[in-house]
Protein backbone atom coordinates (compact mmCIF):
# COMPACT_ATOMS: atom_id res chain seq x y z
CA UNK A 1 0.00 0.00 0.00
CA UNK A 2 1.09 3.57 -0.55
CA UNK A 3 1.82 6.68 1.49
CA UNK A 4 1.81 5.10 4.92
CA UNK A 5 3.95 3.81 7.75
CA UNK A 6 1.03 2.23 9.61
CA UNK A 7 -1.94 -0.04 9.02
CA UNK A 8 -4.02 2.65 7.32
CA UNK A 9 -3.28 5.74 5.22
CA UNK A 10 -5.84 8.45 4.51
CA UNK A 11 -5.90 10.81 1.52
CA UNK A 12 -8.08 13.91 1.17
CA UNK A 13 -9.57 14.96 -2.17
CA UNK A 14 -11.10 18.20 -0.88
CA UNK A 15 -11.21 21.08 -3.35
CA UNK A 16 -7.89 22.61 -2.24
CA UNK A 17 -5.83 19.40 -2.11
CA UNK A 18 -3.29 18.14 -4.67
CA UNK A 19 -6.08 16.47 -6.65
CA UNK A 20 -9.82 16.71 -6.10
CA UNK A 21 -12.95 14.67 -6.80
CA UNK A 22 -15.15 17.65 -7.49
CA UNK A 23 -15.21 19.46 -4.17
CA UNK A 24 -15.18 16.80 -1.47
CA UNK A 25 -13.91 13.25 -1.19
CA UNK A 26 -11.18 11.04 0.16
CA UNK A 27 -9.54 7.63 0.06
CA UNK A 28 -8.34 5.08 2.59
CA UNK A 29 -5.71 2.46 1.74
CA UNK A 30 -4.67 -0.57 3.76
CA UNK A 31 -3.14 -4.01 3.24
CA UNK A 32 -5.11 -5.45 6.16
CA UNK A 33 -8.08 -7.42 4.79
CA UNK A 34 -10.12 -7.27 8.00
CA UNK A 35 -9.64 -3.52 8.34
CA UNK A 36 -10.55 -3.09 4.68
CA UNK A 37 -13.83 -4.97 5.09
CA UNK A 38 -14.71 -3.03 8.26
CA UNK A 39 -14.00 0.29 6.53
CA UNK A 40 -15.98 -0.80 3.46
CA UNK A 41 -18.94 -1.60 5.70
CA UNK A 42 -18.64 1.67 7.61
CA UNK A 43 -18.79 3.77 4.44
CA UNK A 44 -21.73 1.77 3.05
CA UNK A 45 -24.34 2.05 5.81
CA UNK A 46 -23.03 -0.96 7.71
CA UNK A 47 -23.49 -3.50 4.92
CA UNK A 48 -21.66 -6.82 5.07
CA UNK A 49 -19.40 -6.86 2.00
CA UNK A 50 -19.54 -10.63 1.51
CA UNK A 51 -23.34 -10.69 1.77
CA UNK A 52 -23.62 -7.74 -0.62
CA UNK A 53 -21.69 -9.49 -3.38
CA UNK A 54 -23.29 -12.90 -2.82
CA UNK A 55 -26.88 -11.73 -2.43
CA UNK A 56 -29.53 -14.36 -3.15
CA UNK A 57 -31.25 -14.17 -6.53
CA UNK A 58 -34.44 -15.51 -4.97
CA UNK A 59 -36.84 -12.58 -5.40
CA UNK A 60 -38.99 -13.90 -2.54
CA UNK A 61 -36.09 -13.48 -0.11
CA UNK A 62 -35.37 -10.01 1.22
CA UNK A 63 -31.58 -9.41 1.27
CA UNK A 64 -30.73 -8.51 4.86
CA UNK A 65 -27.25 -7.08 4.40
CA UNK A 66 -26.63 -4.72 7.31
CA UNK A 67 -24.62 -6.27 10.15
CA UNK A 68 -23.66 -2.98 11.82
CA UNK A 69 -24.21 0.76 11.84
CA UNK A 70 -22.42 2.79 9.18
CA UNK A 71 -22.44 6.04 7.22
CA UNK A 72 -23.47 6.96 3.70
CA UNK A 73 -19.97 7.91 2.54
CA UNK A 74 -20.10 6.27 -0.86
CA UNK A 75 -18.37 8.18 -3.61
CA UNK A 76 -20.46 8.88 -6.71
CA UNK A 77 -19.55 7.73 -10.22
CA UNK A 78 -19.04 11.30 -11.44
CA UNK A 79 -16.67 11.97 -8.52
CA UNK A 80 -14.76 8.79 -9.37
CA UNK A 81 -14.46 9.90 -13.01
CA UNK A 82 -13.11 13.29 -11.93
CA UNK A 83 -10.64 11.66 -9.55
CA UNK A 84 -9.39 9.17 -12.15
CA UNK A 85 -8.85 11.98 -14.65
CA UNK A 86 -7.06 14.08 -12.03
CA UNK A 87 -4.67 11.17 -11.39
CA UNK A 88 -3.42 11.54 -14.97
CA UNK A 89 -2.42 15.12 -14.13
CA UNK A 90 -0.89 14.36 -10.74
CA UNK A 91 2.77 14.21 -11.83
CA UNK A 92 2.46 17.54 -13.61
CA UNK A 93 0.65 19.12 -10.65
CA UNK A 94 3.45 18.04 -8.29
CA UNK A 95 6.12 19.24 -10.73
CA UNK A 96 4.54 22.71 -10.87
CA UNK A 97 4.14 22.84 -7.09
CA UNK A 98 7.83 22.02 -6.67
CA UNK A 99 8.80 24.72 -9.17
CA UNK A 100 6.67 27.26 -7.31
CA UNK A 101 8.02 26.15 -3.93
CA UNK A 102 11.56 26.60 -5.23
CA UNK A 103 10.77 30.24 -6.02
CA UNK A 104 9.65 30.73 -2.41
CA UNK A 105 12.83 29.02 -1.21
CA UNK A 106 15.17 31.17 -3.31
CA UNK A 107 13.39 34.41 -2.39
CA UNK A 108 13.09 33.71 1.35
CA UNK A 109 16.21 31.68 2.16
CA UNK A 110 18.16 34.73 3.38
CA UNK A 111 15.40 36.03 5.66
CA UNK A 112 16.62 35.42 9.20
CA UNK A 113 13.14 35.96 10.64
CA UNK A 114 11.66 32.88 8.95
CA UNK A 115 12.33 29.15 9.03
CA UNK A 116 11.53 27.71 5.62
CA UNK A 117 11.36 24.12 4.29
CA UNK A 118 14.71 22.84 3.03
CA UNK A 119 14.84 22.33 -0.71
CA UNK A 120 16.31 18.90 -1.42
CA UNK A 121 16.72 17.89 -5.07
CA UNK A 122 16.73 14.20 -4.08
CA UNK A 123 13.26 14.39 -2.52
CA UNK A 124 9.98 15.03 -4.33
CA UNK A 125 7.69 16.92 -1.97
CA UNK A 126 3.99 17.22 -2.80
CA UNK A 127 3.80 20.78 -1.38
CA UNK A 128 0.16 21.00 -0.42
CA UNK A 129 1.10 24.54 0.58
CA UNK A 130 4.33 26.39 1.27
CA UNK A 131 4.50 26.77 5.04
CA UNK A 132 7.00 28.91 6.92
CA UNK A 133 7.69 29.36 10.63
CA UNK A 134 8.05 32.86 12.07
CA UNK A 135 11.18 32.53 14.20
CA UNK A 136 11.40 36.13 15.41
CA UNK A 137 9.21 36.44 18.51
CA UNK A 138 8.88 40.19 17.94
CA UNK A 139 7.04 39.46 14.71
CA UNK A 140 3.29 38.97 15.23
CA UNK A 141 1.67 36.52 12.84
CA UNK A 142 -1.68 38.24 13.33
CA UNK A 143 -0.32 41.64 12.29
CA UNK A 144 1.69 40.14 9.43
CA UNK A 145 -1.32 38.27 8.04
CA UNK A 146 -3.51 41.35 8.36
CA UNK A 147 -0.98 43.46 6.46
CA UNK A 148 -0.50 40.82 3.77
CA UNK A 149 -4.23 40.51 3.17
CA UNK A 150 -4.50 44.29 2.84
CA UNK A 151 -1.94 43.97 0.05
CA UNK A 152 -4.02 41.26 -1.63
CA UNK A 153 -1.79 38.34 -0.62
CA UNK A 154 -3.62 35.05 -0.03
CA UNK A 155 -2.26 33.38 3.10
CA UNK A 156 -3.53 31.25 5.95
CA UNK A 157 -2.32 29.95 9.27
CA UNK A 158 -0.03 26.98 8.74
CA UNK A 159 -2.36 24.43 10.27
CA UNK A 160 -3.70 23.47 13.67
CA UNK A 161 -1.05 21.55 15.63
CA UNK A 162 -2.94 21.88 18.92
CA UNK A 163 -5.93 19.67 18.10
CA UNK A 164 -6.05 18.71 21.78
CA UNK A 165 -7.75 22.09 22.37
CA UNK A 166 -10.81 20.89 20.46
CA UNK A 167 -13.77 20.35 22.80
CA UNK A 168 -13.95 16.58 22.20
CA UNK A 169 -10.30 15.99 23.17
CA UNK A 170 -10.52 18.39 26.11
CA UNK A 171 -13.50 16.53 27.58
CA UNK A 172 -12.43 13.01 26.59
CA UNK A 173 -8.72 13.02 27.45
CA UNK A 174 -8.13 16.06 29.69
CA UNK A 175 -4.88 16.84 27.85
CA UNK A 176 -2.27 19.00 29.55
CA UNK A 177 -0.89 21.41 26.95
CA UNK A 178 2.37 21.66 28.93
CA UNK A 179 3.20 18.22 27.55
CA UNK A 180 3.26 19.61 24.00
CA UNK A 181 5.61 22.64 23.98
CA UNK A 182 6.45 22.34 20.27
CA UNK A 183 2.79 22.34 19.24
CA UNK A 184 2.13 25.32 21.51
CA UNK A 185 5.04 27.17 19.91
CA UNK A 186 3.96 26.42 16.34
CA UNK A 187 0.27 27.25 16.73
CA UNK A 188 0.90 31.00 16.54
CA UNK A 189 4.01 31.02 14.36
CA UNK A 190 3.18 29.24 11.09
CA UNK A 191 2.05 30.83 7.84
CA UNK A 192 1.05 29.11 4.58
CA UNK A 193 1.00 30.25 0.96
CA UNK A 194 -0.54 28.76 -2.17
CA UNK A 195 1.76 27.00 -4.65
CA UNK A 196 -0.69 25.14 -6.89
CA UNK A 197 -0.77 25.11 -10.69
CA UNK A 198 -3.18 28.06 -10.88
CA UNK A 199 -0.62 30.44 -9.33
CA UNK A 200 1.44 32.58 -11.69
CA UNK A 201 5.20 32.49 -11.06
CA UNK A 202 5.41 36.29 -11.32
CA UNK A 203 2.74 36.52 -8.64
CA UNK A 204 4.75 34.22 -6.35
CA UNK A 205 7.78 36.50 -6.66
CA UNK A 206 5.51 39.47 -5.92
CA UNK A 207 4.11 37.68 -2.85
CA UNK A 208 7.64 37.05 -1.57
CA UNK A 209 8.63 40.68 -2.09
CA UNK A 210 5.55 41.92 -0.25
CA UNK A 211 6.13 39.40 2.56
CA UNK A 212 9.74 40.52 3.09
CA UNK A 213 8.75 44.17 2.88
CA UNK A 214 5.99 43.78 5.49
CA UNK A 215 8.29 41.85 7.84
CA UNK A 216 10.84 44.66 7.70
CA UNK A 217 8.17 47.34 8.24
CA UNK A 218 6.66 45.57 11.26
CA UNK A 219 10.04 45.02 12.91
CA UNK A 220 11.12 48.58 12.13
CA UNK A 221 8.06 49.90 13.97
CA UNK A 222 8.93 47.65 16.93
CA UNK A 223 12.34 49.29 17.37
Predicted segments, located by residue:
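Alpha-helical hydrophobic/aromatic positions enriched in membrane-embedded helices and signal peptides
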Residues: 8, 23-24, 69, 188
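Conserved active-site segment immediately N-terminal to the catalytic lysine
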Residues: 1-21, 62-66
Amino acid sequence: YVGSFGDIAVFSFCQDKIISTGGEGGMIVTNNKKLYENIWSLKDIGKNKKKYFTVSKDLNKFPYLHDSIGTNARITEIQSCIGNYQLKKLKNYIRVRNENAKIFFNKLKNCKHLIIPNHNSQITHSYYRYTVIISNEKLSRFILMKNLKKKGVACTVGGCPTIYNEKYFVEKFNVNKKNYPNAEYLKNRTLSFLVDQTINKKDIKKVCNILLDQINKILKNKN
